[in-house]
Amino acid sequence: MKLILTVLAFLSLQVALSDDVGRLYEWSKIDIVGVRPSVYDSSNIIPTGVAYDADSKMLFFGLPRKYSKVPITVAQLSTRSYNSAERRDPPLDKFSGKSKKPLTSVYQPVIDDCRRLWVLDVGIVEVKAERKTYPTKNPALVAFDLTKPDYPEIHRYELTGDAAKTPLGYGGFAVDVVNPKKCGKNDEKTYVYIANFVENSLIVYDKKKSDAWVLKDDSFKPEGVSTYTHNGKEHELKTGIFGIALGDRNKEGNRPAYYLAGSSTKLYRLDTKLLKKKGSKLVPKLIGDRGYKTEAIALAYDPETKVLFFAETDSRQVSCWNIKKELKPENVGVIYSSAKLNFATDMMVDSKGFLWFMSNGQPPFDEKMKYEDPHIRLMKVKTKKAIKGEKRCQG
């Protein structure tokens, strides 16, 4: 009887935590509009990253060529065209942006404060048999202007040398616009910070100087081995720095950069003032530990609530922490928990204060996971509403 009551209490908690979170879309397989079904395998189209432009109400997805027969590597979905209450699994459209060169394989899109869509083309496909179709090239950062029709490409930078080492190890990246009021002007300064979870390094790109460099630190390394459990089997992962999120700007335009390793429960912080100066000695600060089995590969900061959100990989939950409080397990709350959140892979806070998070059921290892139910899920919730019932994350 005690066991039954415990299970019922857990299920009640799941529902309570999940009530305010809206399930927008979910897919078992993804179809692409305008591409003949015979030329692609819909089960191999697995988004790893998502970005939402609140002004156009457009979603953008990174669809890496991790498996064979993936016809496009960036897709879009108009939330105006598909009401999730009517259809949960809409097909995706080909990205309408005008790229000057074909994109090889994109894992994550990011929208910056200037309404530019940045993608990091890793320049290599994971399926060796398809490298004749998609020749390997240098990885590249590419930006598209979302304020103009057809999203023209407005910036491209090829990574070389140490910055291009092990591109399949690129994790999340953050775009730092120092002063959004100067978007598009000659004196605009923008930096991009790219995590590499294999090399345990952070790449810094200076857009104005067209230069990139690599930073190393022990805090970028995995603490040990983390696990992902599926169908009763534990799969081991050992990943270094994976997620990075930027905090509030000060008067000089500098910000805290929060980061975590995929195989760690600790959270660190670096001042972007150091990141932006080539050759600086890093002085990372250990903020604290989130607690047992809280490993995550993605995090997002909400400036309105002063809360960091974490997409935890094996716990199947989204947690939260208010940056005004000490980081310790007692101060970490949970806004969403569901057995259906299979490997949360990306999250973001849009310009209207909504938290978006996605799971795709496919950790970064070779074995492809099998699912009977829809495993690609995209969720949305207003940040203020998300923490309303979670006192630990309130200011």
From Swiss-Prot:
<dbReference type="Pfam" id="PF03022">
    <property type="entry name" value="MRJP"/>
</dbReference>
<dbReference type="InterPro" id="IPR017996">
    <property type="entry name" value="Royal_jelly/protein_yellow"/>
</dbReference>
<dbReference type="GO" id="GO:0005576">
    <property type="term" value="C:extracellular region"/>
</dbReference>
<keyword id="KW-0732">Signal</keyword>
<comment type="function">
    <text>(Microbial infection) Probably enhances infection caused by Leishmania species in the host through augmentation of host neutrophil recruitment into the skin.</text>
</comment>
<dbReference type="InterPro" id="IPR011042">
    <property type="entry name" value="6-blade_b-propeller_TolB-like"/>
</dbReference>
<comment type="function">
    <text>Probably modulates blood feeding of sand flies on vertebrate species by binding and sequestering different mediators involved in the host response. Functions as a chemoattractant for host neutrophils; likely acts through a G-protein-coupled receptor and effect is dependent on calcium influx and phosphatidylinositol 3-kinases (PI3K) activity.</text>
</comment>
<protein>
    <recommendedName>
        <fullName>Yellow-related salivary protein M35</fullName>
    </recommendedName>
</protein>
<keyword id="KW-0964">Secreted</keyword>
<comment type="similarity">
    <text>Belongs to the major royal jelly protein family.</text>
</comment>
<feature type="signal peptide">
    <location>
        <begin position="1"/>
        <end position="18"/>
    </location>
</feature>
